[in-house]
Amino acid sequence: MAARVLGQMVLAVLMASAVAGVAIAAIARVEWPAYNTSNQLHALTTVGQFGCLAGLFAAGLLWRRGRRTLARLGALAFISAFSVVTLAMPLGATKLYLFGVSVDQQFRTEYLTRLTDTAGLHDMTYIGLPPFYPAGWFWLGGRIAAATGTPAWEMFKPWSIVSITIAVALALVLWAAMIRFEYALVATAASTAAMLAYASTEPYAAIITVLMPPVFVLAWAGLRARTRGGGWAAIVGVGIFLGVAALFYTLLLVYAAFTLTIMALCVAVARRHIDPLLRLAVIAVISGAIALLTWAPYLLAAMRGEPADSGTAQHYLPDAGAELHFPMFSLTLHGALCMLGTVWLVVRARTSTRAGALAVAVVAVYAWSLLSMLTTLAGTTLLSFRLQPTLTVLLTTAGAFGFIEATLAIAHRYRPETSRRVVAAATAVGAIGAVTFSQDIPDVLRPDINVAYTDTDGTGQRADRRPPGAERYYREIDAKILEVTGVPRNQTVVLTADYSFLSFYPYYGFQGLTSHYANPLAQFDKRAAAIEGWATLGSADDFVAALDELPWEPPTVFLMRHGANDTYTLRLASDVYPNQPNVRRYHVELDSAVFDDPRFEVSDHGPFVLAIRKPGGKPETDGH
């Protein structure tokens, strides 16, 4: 059984990759109008979604008629195509992914750029440091970009879509291994649609999110196995999943571990036996071993006692993190489905493995949210608002099962002929509901899609064909840096507040976007204090001396903006949690006189001023 499922998972990965790759390439060959100026892409997305949902329905009919191999292949193809058309078609006229290269996507693109430039595990920004944020998704995408010769910023979109599509196909395989094939189709389609609508902006989170419902069901079955020898394949599989989660997204790993701990404790208490806790320990060992693939370098550096800050990654409390989220009370079609799922969980939690697992997972989200609010007393949070997409996917999946069971319960009250009509009517309602929700996904994502068209990409162009931003000067800035320094990009440290420059080119940065994204080993606050101190200097000698005395590799390139009174400015950020917004922006003004020296070459590029410290004063540093 386990070997067969593993083989099906390999096939799913290959099919999803092929479907996504071919579809993305085909869409890219056409000259489309921009999504934010035309409805054509939305219209074609709707047509594609309708075709994919019809294909899934046909796969279910083939299964009932005994054409099971063809049904499995068709289902994998159509669920993959559904994921691709929903994301790739609205983005068909841009090279950027959802939310472009703005805010969070800025540092994600920077991370992918770093791991495209090198196969080694390096921090996205700081030279000589191991990565603090999980590198798994970025490393895989970086290797693909390097192998194909594609710029990392341009690979971000196709890799996001392909990896999400692979996860969707794997979810179908897992569901089909545990429940009836037709039910697996419904559950996967529902959870996929919810994930695409509410989690796809963060692709590596979306991957883990769509796989959580079947994995939690698998875990619940494994932890509740009645015999000592039973359920171990499930335990090993869950351990591998948690290990992959550790490589992709720390928060979802911790939430999943929290949920599994609740499950194990519930079973151990109910049966008055320690076996579920031992199985949980096995899961922890397996996942921990896998996690070390990317976490080991950072942990070793921390154990060596290298200077580090406490980190501020959890210093964020938006409105969504200060209240509990109840999607079942939304007055929408999706809200009604979540309400149906909630009712199903309450009614069936004690009698259904699926309902029991999903109920514990939902309760765990709310428990995590309350704990997050309490941890504000300790000066931090648990970022519970980031679990809202997870909660939505869990309730949507439960709603799909609730719809199926409600339909069957009603049908069983009537004679066979009437019963078939009830099922047919419910199928029609479900299909219409699926199309209705699916065609609204681009509208849910519209703000993120629009940014993908209005941001300036790595070629210096905007996809909506309007005048590009200041980023259009990045190419000539990059050429100037290479000309003056004479070393590869990964041997140069750049100080800039225009962080998207580091998203497009693999230079190291002297300071990160904010402390929330910064490696704790980088000592963000001390670097900020050093930069602020340079504002008091008035001569090149003092400035060069200050650079050479830094405990870190000093910047040799300064990408700044013109300020008033012969100054060059940098716009930096400081953490002001628990205030909201949690970041305070401020300007540091450097006297232009500190760069007025033969040791620096200064040039203007549009709104930018570029100051480069000429080689000769410092030994070369190998960024790898």
UniProtKB/Swiss-Prot annotation:
The UniProt record lists the EC number as 2.4.2.46
Enzyme type, top EC level: transferase
Can you list the GO cellular component terms from the UniProt entry?
A: plasma membrane
Its recorded reaction(s) are: Adds an alpha-D-arabinofuranosyl group from trans,octacis-decaprenylphospho-beta-D-arabinofuranose at the 5-O-position of the eighth, tenth and twelfth galactofuranose unit of the galactofuranan chain of [beta-D-galactofuranosyl-(1->5)-beta-D-galactofuranosyl-(1->6)]14-beta-D-galactofuranosyl-(1->5)-beta-D-galactofuranosyl-(1->4)-alpha-L-rhamnopyranosyl-(1->3)-N-acetyl-alpha-D-glucosaminyl-diphospho-trans,octacis-decaprenol
A single Gene Ontology MF term assigned here is:
transferase activity
Which terms are listed as keywords in the entry?
Answer: Cell membrane, Membrane, Transferase, Transmembrane, Transmembrane helix
Top-level taxon in the UniProt lineage:
Bacteria
Phenotype of null mutants: Allelic exchange at the chromosomal MSMEG_6386 locus of M.smegmatis can only be achieved in the presence of a rescue plasmid carrying a functional copy of MSMEG_6386 or Rv3792, strongly suggesting that this gene is essential.
What is the annotated localization of this protein?
Answer: Cell membrane
Q: InterPro entries this protein is in?
A: ArabinofuranosylTrfase_AftA_C, ArabinofuranosylTrfase_AftA_N
Indicate the transmembrane segments per the record.
Answer: 5-25, 43-63, 73-93, 127-147, 159-179, 181-201, 203-223, 234-254, 280-300, 326-346, 355-375, 391-411, 422-442
Membrane topology note: Multi-pass membrane protein
Give GO BP annotations, semicolon-separated. Answer: capsule polysaccharide biosynthetic process; cell wall macromolecule biosynthetic process; cell wall organization
Q: In which pathway does it act?
A: Cell wall biogenesis; cell wall polysaccharide biosynthesis
Give a short account of what the protein does: Involved in the biosynthesis of the arabinogalactan (AG) region of the mycolylarabinogalactan-peptidoglycan (mAGP) complex, an essential component of the mycobacterial cell wall. It is not able to add an Araf residue to a terminal Galf.
Question: Family assignment?
Answer: Belongs to the glycosyltransferase 85 family.
Q: State the protein's name.
A: Galactan 5-O-arabinofuranosyltransferase
User: What broad taxonomic lineage does this protein's source fall under?
Assistant: Bacteria, Bacillati, Actinomycetota, Actinomycetes, Mycobacteriales
